[in-house]
Amino acid sequence: MGSGTSAVNPQVGAIVRGRGHHGGMVHRTRVVKAARRAEVRLPELVGFTGGELTPDGDYDGLEFRDLDFAGQDGAGARFMDCALTSCALDETGLRHARVLDSVLTGIRGVGTDLAEATLRDVELVDARLGGAQLHGAVLERVLVRGGKIDYLNLRNARLKDVVFESCVLVEPDFGGARLERVAFADCVLKGADLTAATLVDVDLRGAAELDVARGLDRLSGAVISHAQLLDLAPVLAAEMGLRVAEV
């Protein structure tokens, strides 16, 4: 690299500046690796007419529309190339379920159990959920766009290439979770718990509101904006036991 030149590697979002091979300081700023967004392309679907969900059920290429699955047990079920639209999932049991290459639009429910489930290449659009249980779950290439999710339990979950976009998350619990290449874009994050979480290439700069209730010390693997740093300053000072006073 020649004197005063700069190079950008778009795959890793890194900016490198330096003076080349003739000495002097080389300054490297690694911003953040971008999340790979889910891009689901569904085949032609067949309407679901099977009645209730069943444990370990196998659902492939189906459309579930305006159905009430409240209280039903679909533990261990597999959903592949499916669309769930405007379905009720109140206390629906989907523990260990696998949701693959699917689109969930306008789903709603309280206490939906997706503990230790796998969501891969999934779009979750305009969901209205409360107390959804995804502890120990694996989320890979998942897009959460729009909607509101209260008290989301992601304790000890693994998130990789996940994007939260234009949604509201109230008191999400990421305790002990691993977040890698996760982005928050125009997303409201209220009262987040990051206790014992591991963050790698987590981009919080696009969050419309950023409120971390616990686990501020786990933000070392995240990127925030200058404005967000100022907003977090009082909480950071309190966390460090730092007193701030005028002269």
What is the role of each PLM region?
Residues 26-247:
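Tandem repeat scaffolds
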